[in-house]
């Protein structure tokens, strides 16, 4: 899974 930071943006 991609980092949450990238998911939010």
From Swiss-Prot:
Record carries keyword Metal-binding: yes
Uppermost EC category: oxidoreductase
> How and how many cofactors are bound, per the record note?
Binds 2 calcium ions per subunit. Binds 1 heme b (iron(II)-protoporphyrin IX) group per subunit.
On whether Oxidoreductase is a keyword of this UniProt record, the answer is: yes
Which cofactors are required for activity? Ca(2+); heme b
Under which EC number(s) is this enzyme classified? 1.11.1.7
Tell me which residues are glycosylated: 5
Query: Which Gene Ontology terms cover its molecular function?
Result: lactoperoxidase activity; metal ion binding
Please give the biological process terms from Gene Ontology that the record holds.
Answer: hydrogen peroxide catabolic process
Q: Which reaction does it catalyse?
A: 2 a phenolic donor + H2O2 = 2 a phenolic radical donor + 2 H2O
- Please provide the record's keywords in A-Z order: Calcium, Glycoprotein, Heme, Hydrogen peroxide, Iron, Metal-binding, Oxidoreductase, Peroxidase
Main role?
A: Removal of H(2)O(2), oxidation of toxic reductants, biosynthesis and degradation of lignin, suberization, auxin catabolism, response to environmental stresses such as wounding, pathogen attack and oxidative stress. These functions might be dependent on each isozyme/isoform in each plant tissue.
Family (UniProt): Belongs to the peroxidase family. Classical plant (class III) peroxidase subfamily.
Name of the protein: Peroxidase 8
Query: Which organism was this protein described from?
Result: Daucus carota (Wild carrot)
Q: What is the lineage of its organism?
A: Eukaryota, Viridiplantae, Streptophyta, Embryophyta, Tracheophyta
């Amino acid at each position: 899974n991609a980092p949450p930071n990238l998911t939010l943006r």
